[in-house]
């Protein structure tokens, strides 16, 4: 099954990372976790400028484990990074 997942954080200027919640950092942890699952990340889109922390990152994943397993994995990681997520099944 194909899913599109949006991770939302708090964007900001790269010189003030203390004021942001970087969804790219969160995604790095998600990516690491997904390596142990039946998931294959097929697309990543996040950030538009070198000196800006983005407010969101969108990635696509093929998963045979289903949406509930994705939610189970994403919830604690996103909470740790002060981010939220939304899963779409286009």
Question: What kind of region is each of these model predictions?
Answer:
Residues 1-90:
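Midchain, well-structured core segments that form catalytic/ion-binding scaffolds
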């Amino acid at each position: 099954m194909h899913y599109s997942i949006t991770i939302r954080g708090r964007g900001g200027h790269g010189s003030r990372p203390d004021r942001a919640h970087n969804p790219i950092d969160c995604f790095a942890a998600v990516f690491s976790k997904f390596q142990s699952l039946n998931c294959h990340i097929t697309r990543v889109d996040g950030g538009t400028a070198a000196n800006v922390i983005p407010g969101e990152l969108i990635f696509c994943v093929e998963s045979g484990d289903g949406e509930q397993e994705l939610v189970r994995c994403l919830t604690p990681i996103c909470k740790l990074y002060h981010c939220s997520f939304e899963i779409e099944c286009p």
